[in-house]
Structure formats: C-alpha cells, structure tokens
Amino acid sequence: MVKVGIVGGTGYTGVELLRLLAQHPQAEVVVITSRSEAGLPVADMYPNLRGHYDGLAFSVPDVKTLGACDVVFFATPHGVAHALAGELLAAGTKVIDLSADFRLQDPVEWAKWYGQPHGAPELLQDAVYGLPEVNREQIRNARLIAVPGCYPTATQLGFLPLLEAGIADNTRLIADCKSGVSGAGRGLNIGSLYSEANESFKAYAVKGHRHLPEITQGLRRAARGDIGLTFVPHLVPMIRGIHSTLYATVTDRSVDLQALFEKRYADEPFVDVMPAGSHPETRSVRGANVCRIAVHRPQDGDLVVVLSVIDNLVKGASGQAVQNMNILFGLDERAGLSHAGMMP
C-alpha cells in the first residue's frame, strides 16, 4: 500500500485527489494539510467523502510527518512546493506537484510569467514533466514530477501526432481553448461568481497566458525545433471541462490523419481517438481521466482541425497526478482511474 500525503487539501484539485484516491486499491491517504483548516475532519468539509476519510483531519504541514509518506502531492498555489520539495526529496519521499512550480525548465522564464524568482532552481534538473503519453519511461524513475496544466494537456495531446510526424507547418499553430470556471480555482474571484460567469462567454489573457510557455516548451520537443503558437483561452459557463479547437496547416493531402492519430495513441489507456467525423463533448469526459480527440480536414483542404476535450480537474490535474503515481510505483496505470464520464 502506497502511503500518500497531500499538501493543500482544500482546493478543487485537492478534493479531486481525495475523491480519486478513495477508490484506489493500492493507495492510502495518511496526511492532508491545510494551515487554515487544521484540526477539521476532512469529511466535515467534504460531505461527499463521508465514509471514506472519517478518521482523517487536516493538519499543519510538517516535513517530518510528510517525509514518512511514500509520495506527497502538492495541490497548492505556485511557490509553495519550492519551499518544501527539497526537504521531502532529501528524506526519500517522492514528490508529485500539481502546481506550475517545476513545469518550466528555464527558471528565468518561470519568473517572467509568475512574477517572482524561482524558489528552487537547483531541483529543475530532477523534475520530470508528467505527461505520460510522452515521458512514461522517465516518470518510472523520477523523484520529482511536474504534473502538466489543463490547457497544456489538452493542447499537446491534440497537436503531438502532427508535430512528431513532421507534417505540419510548425510556424502557424493555433489553439482556441475553452475552460469551465473550476479552472480558476476555489478562491474568491469576481470573474468566477455565478452572476458574472453564467450566461456569458469571454476570452481572456489574449496577450499571454501563463500556460503558453509550458505548451510551447512541449511542442518544441515534439517538433524538434521552434514553433509558432497563438493560444487564446476562453471562460465558458460550465463547472468542469476543457475544449481545445486546434488548427494546423498540413499541405500533404495524402496523409491519412485518422490512421496517424489512431496509431499514435493505440497503446494509451487514457487517450480516446474517436471515429472520423466525430465531435467530442466535454460532458463525455466529466469525472474521467480521459482525453477524447477527433481530427478533421474541412473541405479536404490544407487546414487540419483537431478537437481535444478533457476534464480540467481529472486528466487536466488530479487524475493525471494519480496516473503518474501509478507509473512511478509500478502499479497498474489504470488503478483508481477507471471511472467513466458522467452523463448527463
């Protein structure tokens, strides 16, 4: 049984970790921290978890207690893992970070986008980017795993087959992405209030979103060279979900795009390439650790459109974190992640 600690258990990714791990046959949450809620039983904050964590209460983060775990998940704002990850790694504990702290390999670039100096640049050489569909072998031997963001997960999985095959114009990629309001987190945010977000649809951070350098970093690796990406995120009035509509120019019309995508993801348990002509919906992945993809070539032209959908809290965060844990500890990759999407 893998002994699990969670730092930051009061946000959406924290409670989603608890929900998924409650059904995991080979993992047990033994520590969960929150400075503001220390002493409060988990089941009192989250009644949906009654009967699963009745003996577990939030506690103040303590390195000694956390260091006794096999793995610690950080479901925290950026900057928190910088302060604690090094001590936990020194104690022999594996770290899986759901924040952005170790996703970018360049600490200067990280500081530019997150508005503060990187707090642990010496750990970046140990950090493995936790996108299993790309880095599965590195994850197996990792000490520190950086779980990808939600937009980067949906966008990279959609573009990867085209860039790896070298058939797209890498200088003119477009990612038109929509997210539910849970992507903004559980904290008080005027833009996430019901009366602000309901019955409204808007773009934001068009000048530059923090996920842009992460997406670009991953796509450069896939393309083995520079890429040009326009990334525009939008907020839509739903709770969960990411829908990425991706555009790339592929001038070779002889390429069987459906076969290309099916072959690339044939052995991936959590990527579903849908039949030709399909239009994946976010509701089909709600609560599931799945990325559903469809590829189109409208009017048989040069422009290829890829549709990629995920649940931002599952495959875009906590589910992918558990998937990484399973790989890291040699477990069945599907363990605790067999939930089908919730419909309606």
UniProtKB/Swiss-Prot annotation:
Q: Name one GO molecular function term.
A: N-acetyl-gamma-glutamyl-phosphate reductase activity
Is-annotated flag, keyword Lyase? no
What is the E.C. number?
A: 1.2.1.38
Q: Give the SUPFAM superfamilies listed for this entry.
A: Glyceraldehyde-3-phosphate dehydrogenase-like, C-terminal domain, NAD(P)-binding Rossmann-fold domains
Annotated pathway? Amino-acid biosynthesis; L-arginine biosynthesis; N(2)-acetyl-L-ornithine from L-glutamate: step 3/4
Its Gene Ontology biological processes? L-arginine biosynthetic process
Q: Which domain of life is it from?
A: Bacteria
Q: What class of enzyme is it?
A: oxidoreductase
Task: Output the InterPro entries linked to this UniProt entry.
Answer: AGPR_AS, AGPR_type-1, NAD(P)-bd_dom_sf, NAGSA_dehydrogenase, Semialdehyde_DH_NAD-bd
Q: Which CDD domains match?
A: AGPR_1_C (cd23934), AGPR_1_N (cd17895)
Gene3D superfamilies, alphabetically?
Dihydrodipicolinate Reductase, domain 2 (3.30.360.10), NAD(P)-binding Rossmann-like Domain (3.40.50.720)
Which terms in the GO cellular component ontology are assigned? cytoplasm
Reaction(s) catalysed by this chain, per the record, are: N-acetyl-L-glutamate 5-semialdehyde + phosphate + NADP(+) = N-acetyl-L-glutamyl 5-phosphate + NADPH + H(+)
Q: Which residues form the active site?
A: 150
A Pfam family (short name) is: Semialdhyde_dhC_1
Q: Where in the cell is it found?
A: Cytoplasm
**Keywords of the record:** Amino-acid biosynthesis, Arginine biosynthesis, Cytoplasm, NADP, Oxidoreductase
What is the first-listed, main subcellular location in coarse terms? cytoplasm
Q: Which family does it belong to?
A: Belongs to the NAGSA dehydrogenase family. Type 1 subfamily.
Which NCBIfam families would you find in this protein's record?
A: argC (TIGR01850)
List, alphabetically, the PANTHER family matched.
Answer: N-ACETYL-GAMMA-GLUTAMYL-PHOSPHATE REDUCTASE, CHLOROPLASTIC-RELATED, N-ACETYL-GAMMA-GLUTAMYL-PHOSPHATE REDUCTASE, CHLOROPLASTIC-RELATED-RELATED
Function, as annotated: Catalyzes the NADPH-dependent reduction of N-acetyl-5-glutamyl phosphate to yield N-acetyl-L-glutamate 5-semialdehyde.
Q: What's the protein called, per UniProt? A: N-acetyl-gamma-glutamyl-phosphate reductase
Q: Which organism is it from?
A: Pseudomonas syringae pv. tomato (strain ATCC BAA-871 / DC3000)
Gene it is expressed from: argC
